[in-house]
Amino acid sequence: MDQTFEKRKKVIYDFICDDFYIPMKVKEIATVLQVSKEQRRELQEVLDALVEEGKITLSKRGKYSKGQAKRITGTFQANIRGFGFVMVEGEDEDIFIPGENVNGAFQGDEVECIITGAPGGKRKEGKIVRIVSHQVKKIVGLYEKSKSFGFVRPDNQRYLKDIYIPAGKEMDAMDGHKVVVELTSYGQEHAKPEGKIVEIIGHVNDPGADILSIVKDYDLPTEFPEKVLNQAVRVGKDVSEADCAGRLDLRDWQMVTIDGEDAKDLDDAVSLTMKDENYQLGVHIADVTNYVQEKSALDREALKRGTSVYLADRVIPMLPHVLSNGICSLNAGEDRLALSCIMTVSPKGEVIDHQIAETVIRVDKRMSYTGVSKVLAEEPEALKEDEDFVPMIQKMQELSTILRERRGKRGSIDFDFPETKIELDEKGKPINIKPYERNSATKIIEDFMLLANETVAEEYFWREVPFLYRTHEVPDEEKIKKLSTFINNFGYHIHVHDEVKPKEIQKLLSQVEGTPEEALISRLTLRSMCQAKYTLENTGHFGLAAKYYTHFTSPIRRYPDLQIHRIIKENLRGRLNENRIEHYDKILPEVAKQCSDRERLAEETEREVVKMKKAEYMRMHIGEEYEGVISGVTKWGIYVELPNTVEGLVHVVDLRDDHYNFIEQTYEMVGEHTGKTYKLGEKVRVRVSDADKLLRTINFELA
């Protein structure tokens, strides 16, 4: 909308807000303001816009009055520059809050705001009118001591003010300590928040203090309660013959685990034999529920955590290590209890028969992704070392290829963004950063786990019992329209009828593969997708193009898997009666929400640790030059990604050879005088100019 329209809105709004105004119909307003017949349509549009913004109301009799602004409740997200946003649950678009309208709101507060406008048809603007509740109780930061008091500088830059620590509330913290501070006052516009120190994490330079600070900032648990540890220790260390009673005995089946070299919690093993022309694939999952009883201290703590969190220097496990690395881990040469999904798969990759059973297994060998990929590459040493397993591994790759092709044909989407592997020295300093290798061995396990998850989900969908599904909804229509408009600038199209199909997204990603705009379009496409979550209703998984999907294969590190194992075992034992069904109907909605929330929190924590360690690593390489690729272009600069997955920003002010303008349609920077362009996918040489570990930012300049 243009400026003229906005000015007219202001004139009409001021008129209706006048103390002498009485409610009028559109014709009456037109008469009083001497609006010509030709302009009445625009007057109606102005009135409609003001009604939509909540500034005025329209009565049943067609009269306009000053509106009682509708109050919207949401969560305040502060910005380092003083403004912020209110995020409203269920709404895709946040409400922008200018600095002068923040009204003392604190990062994370639950607030009420009113809409003040949507200038130029852009995002809604608002004003905070009430702080409903302060959600943040504790903050992590750096303690700075003075003679009679101290301050804590928050690590999270969204907390815009330092926290004042009065004398006697510092818990003997010293200058340079990383601390947790409990807020006692949230401050005023011109007064700092106050607090007391409740935990000293360690000195800022202590190994691991940086990652532990992020862990504390996200309020992740670092210790297990004593009751939980005691319960874990009491669990037996061996599988007895009594434990095996009534179970399908698969100890003579050839099977292996395939994991990363440093993995300790091995919760899945695989077996494969041929049955005529069909494959008999066994996916054998640790029977954790045998040791974690429902409603026990162990179970309550596992649900509270929801998931294990994998960070650069540590794992925050869902279950105590004595269980996750002990009796629950499918260690080679030891009897273990499992829940197995044994599938007969046709040469076309179709599951034509399956059995889910409680089993006892004995893994023959612990193998690594690296070792298996060497076998598949037919390296002589690897073939000799693993000669007993070579035929099975080769058949596994054969089946993996069939399954992957079958998923591809139905429209399964693979974004294939490289994950980052960070190597640390003994002091916690990053010494190397590189992309995680995704090889043929990782794909085998991925394909087999996906198949087991789909098979289990389909069986329990048709059984019509309470269950947890892993669902991924069809993308929002508006988001896909925006994506479609954007990719048209590059000559790509998405065919959307009633709703977009996975095949259309898959086709787009295939078309952009290897092009300069691949990274940007892939990222924007990913952002157009919904987030996967846990639900009781099976609505399918859009990204996998799967009608049925669940999480069955990782009960050591994910609570939803543990939860469905319980339901499956009760069903296998004939104990899933009306009372138990009623019980699951009652508890599963909260379990689904808790697990979805904890998963998002874990992902955010993992992401922040990676960003921090990348900045710390590049800080040690300031002045060095690298080859990179332009991965993003914005009005404030160009983003360049290095082969090691590190991404940094070349600020537009550092493009000194010309004045550059951002062309939004094609995501280019164009020099006004030289006509020089910087485009997506273009190779550039950059020099590291700055890296800030606290802000987790990296800056480059063109070399």
Give names to the regions the model predicted:
Residues 1-282, 289-335, 371-374, 667-669, ...:
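Charge-lined substrate channels and their catalytic hotspots, especially those that engage the 3′ end
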Residues 31, 185-186, 213-216, 220, ...:
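Electropositive polyanion-binding surfaces
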Residues 201, 701-703:
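Short beta-strand-to-coil "C-cap" segments at the C-terminal boundary of structured domains/repeats
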